[in-house]
Amino acid sequence: GGADCADQWGDVTHDESLSDFVLTPGFVEGHAHMMAGAIWDFAYAGYHDRIDPDGKLWSGKGDLNTVIGDLSDYEKTLPDDQPLVGWGLDPIFLQDERLSRKHLDQISETRPIAVMFSNFHLMCVNSKALEMVGYSNETNAEGVIKDDAGHPTGELQEMAAMFPVMRRLGIDFRSLSQTEPAVRSYAKVCQRAGVTTVTDLFSTLTDEDVTTLTRVTGEAQFPVRIVPALAAIGAAPAEIAQFALKLRSMSTDKLRLGAVKLMTDGSIQGWTARVKWPGYV
């Protein structure tokens, strides 16, 4: 209402200290990952329309034909020696058969191709990528999915199976998350979504990472508060707890440290999570 909207209730005090400001809503995102910005260096293959950090709209892919067609167009823009990496695919939304190497081989049989699923716990690769890492019908490794004839379908589930491909194709979650350009790109994504406080939910947080985050988030114009959760991996529980306490003491206004994330399982929507009957306990 106007300045006199409360006068009907008697004497009031008019506080005009904020009259020249614009109040905008904030939003807290409790499950997100820093690579949501830099991942746009790769080809988007998801179902929903998405806007990249620079404001460009990328249309969703409603069926496998569109996924393959759009990735084929993207492939034509790449140098001959560069792999094709896609991301964002979620088979749950697609009514077609499941993505396999036979689909990706339609794009190229000579260029290695990997498409990360939206949960980043699974990927599908083409025959060239399988060849690069030595996966074949003789491979006996958990996560290397095979068809009824015993041949790899191209689907790889969880890090143990995916990492050999990731290493050779240059898919590095750390560089997608902890470099200065990645942090700034993440902030752009948040800003476009109206997010003012966001986590990075499974962060390595080395000394170098913390130095970069402190410097970049400390800039007056940096638009978001980041609350990273330390990845509880690679050390004894007591050491992780001690490091988390150290991090907490280093918090700043726009970098809140000290949270820890335990990851003990896989992806529910990717069917790699080990949950009890009836499937969600």
Language-model features: locations:
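Divalent metal-binding segments
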Residues: 1-243, 258, 262-281
